[in-house]
């Protein structure tokens, strides 16, 4: 049996997420996956070029000003993603030590310290 009532369908515009800062920052954070895809494609191209002895093509590709600009934008996006992740992690992860909740700043600073140490280790390994 069918009903004659009309179902209420709430109108949702395509720019709904631009109204509140929280949603805007969330959508920007989620859009950083594009930067990750770009980085993975460049890395894949570099590995393939290295294996096929076409490293000169990859070096000239990497020196293209457009690629450099895209890499800088990608780095900024990835840093934004990491920064927002490190701010959110203490809010959703509860660590209890001796029946007391760990200070969220300790966890956030520990994440940044680990990131810095891993980055420093990568730089040392590259330039040895």
Swiss-Prot record:
Its main location: membrane. It is found in: Cell inner membrane. Disulfide bonds: none annotated. One of its GO terms (molecular function) is succinate dehydrogenase activity. Pfam families: Fumarate_red_C. Keywords: Cell inner membrane, Cell membrane, Membrane, Transmembrane, Transmembrane helix. The keyword Cell membrane applies. Signal peptide: none annotated. It is a multi-pass membrane protein. It comes from the Bacteria. GO terms for cellular component: fumarate reductase complex; plasma membrane. The keyword Transmembrane applies. Anchors the catalytic components of the fumarate reductase complex to the cell membrane, binds quinones. Part of an enzyme complex containing four subunits: a flavoprotein (FrdA), an iron-sulfur protein (FrdB), and two hydrophobic anchor proteins (FrdC and FrdD). Belongs to the FrdC family. This is Fumarate reductase subunit C. It comes from Haemophilus ducreyi (strain 35000HP / ATCC 700724).
């Amino acid at each position: 049996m069918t009903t004659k009532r009309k179902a209420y369908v709430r109108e949702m515009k395509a720019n709904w997420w631009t109204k509140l800062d929280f949603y805007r920052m969330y959508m920007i954070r989620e859009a950083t996956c594009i930067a990750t895809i770009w980085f993975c494609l460049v890395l894949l191209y570099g590995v393939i070029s290295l294996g096929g002895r076409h490293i000169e093509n990859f070096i000239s590709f990497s020196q293209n000003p457009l690629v450099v600009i895209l890499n800088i934008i990608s780095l900024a996006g990835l840093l934004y993603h990491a920064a927002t992740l490190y701010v959110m992690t203490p809010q959703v992860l509860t660590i209890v030590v001796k029946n007391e909740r760990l200070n969220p700043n300790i966890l956030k600073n520990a994440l940044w310290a680990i990131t810095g140490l891993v980055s420093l280790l990568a730089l040392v390994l590259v330039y040895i």
